[in-house]
């Protein structure tokens, strides 16, 4: 029918003819490169194309071929020789003409329309604009209908008549040779032969041929006979279920489709639909299948199929299973701060919330703090005051292991404003390979054991637990004459082995050596009860490990007065008086009672004091 002189690239498949069969487009442009590009776009859009580089050749093609050979002409405005306007005037309305140019000039657009062009396009044209040029052909066909026919038709009938006017003729009937008859299958073969010999329907939308037949019948007796396609449409039976049909997909390419079941569109799960699904799932408690869930979702106004619900249910159950496995893995992890039972640290499992003292005025001093179970059994009380909380136990190893293993779960116990700062309180070498008491510095700045500080910042023994430290550690120094003790945190300590090592030869005793960092095989617990005779003099100081760093009597006096505020001493107290300083000592059975309100530095009337252990009196 049409001349396809455009080169189709390899691999490109031309679409099938639409409801016009295939519109034939005559393209005219003196730019050969753009002409080939435009021809290719038209071919891929489903049109038959003939291209010419001059208006003279295009006019010659229109004159030589029948009237319906070209359905539309596309021409450039500016061409050498005969331009687009000259070609438009020579065609004289026989074929609809679309004019195009590079410039989008309003004057040019108005001029082309006023001269009879059906449309004006700007170069370069897009494939979307090319695809819908069939609308101009349809509009031109509608305008060409007879006046008497158009007045008696509805708007929909106008469209049907225009389509019928350009409908292609039906293809010739296919005649197949008859196959040799076989016994038993004659009736079936005759039926198949009759079906093959029937004429296939033309590719015309439903209702178009009937409307066209009505148009031709209304022309009267003097009109010519309708085309064969229209006459055949008037006699054609109505379409049955399952028969092929033609559908318009937004372009002129209408393909014949069978009466198969239509594919449902894909359902997109949104937040609203998923919320309704979860609500239905939880209401049924996973006891019903997709059918019940679908019914509950329909109550919320969400309509889905059973297959869609089943697919979403499988995905949701898989997601729940993965979340459950993640939760189990997290809860069973040994590093999980919330998993106390699975922790491998033995010391950690023995820490609990309880109180060291269960009776008396100080029963609530340590209430609500993590306390080791051994703190109440061995009599050696060690405290560490931190910003996160006070930990009370028997030794620094327990505290260090507890803090270093679980500092991320219970808050950082080693850090700023903490008495333990990147070093162990009672160990030889810290976790970062530093001596705990290198160069005489016990811990952090402002510690109770450095620079002679009386314990204003970072003090090891706090006010609220001093009495318990005294009662737990003091009896180890009783029973022998006491001499002035040396500093507890000096460079003379042998390899800094012990933080509380007694360097005074007068008070040195196998049982009074280091109670925590034991470097002597003969040493014992500091809590072993020993009798100590209290000495007298201006330099008398009790060798209390918990009161390390008190290098002068003034600091000692200030600290003791600040700690023993009120009635805290009772009978069984031995007081050593040297005029300006008093020191206290208790045996293992000493009762912490009350202190006279005058304080420890005031002069006592009687210089005779009774030893709480053996009742011996001590001289002034």
UniProtKB/Swiss-Prot annotation:
Tell me the Pfam families matching this sequence: Response_reg (PF00072)
In Gene Ontology terms, what is a biological process of this protein?
cytokinin-activated signaling pathway
Q: Does the keyword Membrane apply?
A: no
How does inactivating the gene affect the organism?
Dwarf, narrow leaf, lesion mimic, low tillering, altered kernel color, viviparous and low fertility phenotypes.
Modification 4-aspartylphosphate occurs at:
76
A GO molecular function assigned to this protein is:
DNA binding
Biased amino acid composition, Polar residues: 431-456, 603-620
Region annotation Disordered: where it falls in the sequence: 171-197, 215-257, 431-457, 501-523, 596-620
| Alphabetically ordered keywords of this record | Activator, Cytokinin signaling pathway, DNA-binding, Nucleus, Phosphoprotein, Transcription, Transcription regulation, Two-component regulatory system
Which intervals hold domain Response regulatory?
Answer: 24-138
Presence of keyword Hydrolase: no
Instruction: Please give the DNA-binding region boundaries.
Output: 261-321
Location relative to the cell: Nucleus
Q: How is it modified after translation?
A: Two-component system major event consists of a His-to-Asp phosphorelay between a sensor histidine kinase (HK) and a response regulator (RR). In plants, the His-to-Asp phosphorelay involves an additional intermediate named Histidine-containing phosphotransfer protein (HPt). This multistep phosphorelay consists of a His-Asp-His-Asp sequential transfer of a phosphate group between first a His and an Asp of the HK protein, followed by the transfer to a conserved His of the HPt protein and finally the transfer to an Asp in the receiver domain of the RR protein.
Q: What does this protein do?
A: Transcriptional activator that binds specific DNA sequence. Functions as a response regulator involved in His-to-Asp phosphorelay signal transduction system. Phosphorylation of the Asp residue in the receiver domain activates the ability of the protein to promote the transcription of target genes. May directly activate some type-A response regulators in response to cytokinins.
UniProt name for this protein:
Two-component response regulator ORR27
């Amino acid at each position: 029918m049409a001349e396809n002189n455009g080169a189709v690239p390899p691999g490109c498949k031309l679409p099938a003819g639409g409801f016009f069969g295939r519109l034939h487009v005559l393209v005219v442009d003196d730019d050969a490169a753009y002409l080939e590009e435009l021809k290719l776009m038209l071919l891929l859009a489903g049109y038959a194309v003939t291209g010419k580089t001059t208006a003279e050749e295009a006019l010659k093609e229109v004159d030589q071929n029948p009237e319906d050979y070209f359905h539309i002409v596309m021409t450039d405005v500016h061409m050498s020789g005969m331009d687009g306007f000259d070609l438009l005037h020579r065609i004289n309305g026989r074929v609809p003409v679309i004019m195009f140019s590079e410039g989008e000039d309003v004057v040019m657009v108005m001029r082309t329309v006023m001269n009879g062009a059906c449309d004006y396009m700007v170069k370069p044209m897009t494939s979307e604009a090319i695809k819908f040029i069939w609308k101009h052909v349809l509009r031109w066909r509608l305008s060409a209908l007879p006046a008497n026919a158009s007045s008696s038709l509805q708007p929909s009938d106008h469209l049907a008549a225009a389509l019928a006017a350009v409908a292609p003729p039906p293809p010739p009937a296919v005649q197949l040779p008859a196959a040799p008859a076989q016994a038993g299958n004659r009736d079936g073969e005759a039926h198949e032969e009759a079906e093959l010999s029937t004429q296939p329907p033309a590719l015309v939308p439903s209702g178009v041929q009937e409307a066209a037949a009505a148009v031709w019948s209304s022309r009267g007796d003097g009109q010519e006979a309708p085309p064969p396609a229209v006459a055949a449409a008037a006699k054609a039976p109505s379409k049955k279920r399952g028969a092929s049909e033609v559908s318009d997909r937004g372009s002129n390419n209408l393909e014949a489709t069978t009466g198969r079941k239509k594919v449902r569109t894909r359902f997109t799960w949104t937040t609203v639909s998923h919320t309704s699904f979860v609500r239905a799932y939880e209401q049924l408690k996973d006891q019903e299948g997709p059918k019940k869930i679908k019914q509950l979702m329909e109550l919320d106004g969400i309509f889905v199929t059973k297959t869609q619900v089943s697919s979403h249910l499988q995905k949701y159950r898989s997601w729940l299973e993965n979340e459950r496995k993640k939760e189990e893995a997290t809860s069973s992890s040994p590093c999980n701060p919330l998993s106390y039972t699975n922790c491998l640290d033995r010391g950690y499992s023995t820490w609990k919330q309880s109180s060291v003292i269960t009776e008396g005025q100080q029963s609530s001093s340590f209430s609500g703090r993590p306390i080791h179970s051994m703190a109440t059994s061995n009599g050696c009380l060690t405290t560490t005051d931190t910003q996160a909380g006070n930990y009370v136990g028997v030794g620094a190893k327990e505290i260090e292991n507890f803090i270093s293993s679980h500092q991320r779960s219970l808050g950082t116990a080693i850090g700023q404003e903490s008495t333990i700062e990147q070093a162990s309180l009672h160990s030889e070498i810290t976790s970062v390979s530093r001596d705990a008491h290198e160069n005489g510095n016990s811990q952090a700045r402002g510690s109770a054991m450095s620079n002679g500080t009386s314990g204003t910042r970072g003090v090891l023994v706090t006010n609220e637990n001093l009495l318990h430290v005294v009662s737990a550690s003091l009896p180890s120094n009783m029973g022998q004459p006491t001499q002035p003790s040396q500093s507890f945190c000096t460079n003379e300590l042998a390899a800094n082995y012990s933080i509380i090592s007694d360097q005074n030869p007068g008070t040195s005793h196998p049982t009074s050596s280091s109670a925590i960092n034991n470097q002597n095989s003969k040493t014992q617990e500091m809590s072993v009860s020993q009798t100590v005779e209290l000495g007298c003099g201006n330099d008398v100081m009790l060798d209390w490990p918990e009161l390390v760093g008190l290098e002068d009597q003034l600091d000692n006096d200030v600290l003791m007065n600040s700690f023993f505020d009120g009635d805290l001493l009772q009978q069984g107290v031995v007081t050593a008086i040297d005029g300006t300083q008093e020191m206290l000592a208790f045996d293992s059975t000493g009762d912490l009672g009350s202190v006279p309100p005058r304080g420890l530095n005031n002069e006592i009337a009687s210089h005779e004091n009774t030893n709480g252990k053996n009742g011996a009196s001590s001289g002034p």
